[in-house]
Amino acid sequence: MKKTSDGFTVRTETDTFSAKKLILAAGGCAGSKVGGVMDGYQLAKNLGHHRTQLYPSLVQLKTDPTYPRALKGIKAECGIAIRRDNASVAENRGEVLFTEYGVSGPAIFDLSRAVSTGGEGLYCVLNFFPDWDLEEVLHWLHLRRQTMAAHE
């Protein structure tokens, strides 16, 4: 592969192709355990491109395993906030899957970039009752307590 004055030339074992534009689809380094490599980045660099710093995105969030392990396998619709010093860095709402190592699911994937680039001191807050105000949650808990006590 070579950059020319009017585009690019790509040589294979049997042919040579010329084009004004070139699409480089080489994957990335994610999933190195299943074959992800840096070759595409090197090819782009050889053509004069540069890249920004690499960081994980669209990934699960690892947490202290004490908490999610008990909920492993459970899915819940939640409001999710990534916070630092009680200030929101990023928010989302959607399905959260509890795993042995933390939390996953589409809503978590959407927020993972904010965590990857956010630096130190971040924490995740899950709201299991995103449509309820505090009074409604307390009322529901009170009713559940009465129901559970009646079954003892």
Where are these regions (language model features)?
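A conserved short coil-to-beta-strand element within the FAD-binding core of flavoproteins
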Residues: 1-7
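Acidic surface patches and DE-rich sequence motifs
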Residues: 4, 12, 84
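N-terminal small/polar loop signature for handling phosphorylated ligands or for N-terminal nucleophile
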Residues: 8-11, 15, 65, 70
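Surface loops and adjacent helix of pleckstrin homology
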Residues: 13, 22, 56, 112
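Glycine-rich beta-alpha-beta "Rossmann" dinucleotide-binding loop(s) and their flanking helix/strand
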Residues: 32-52
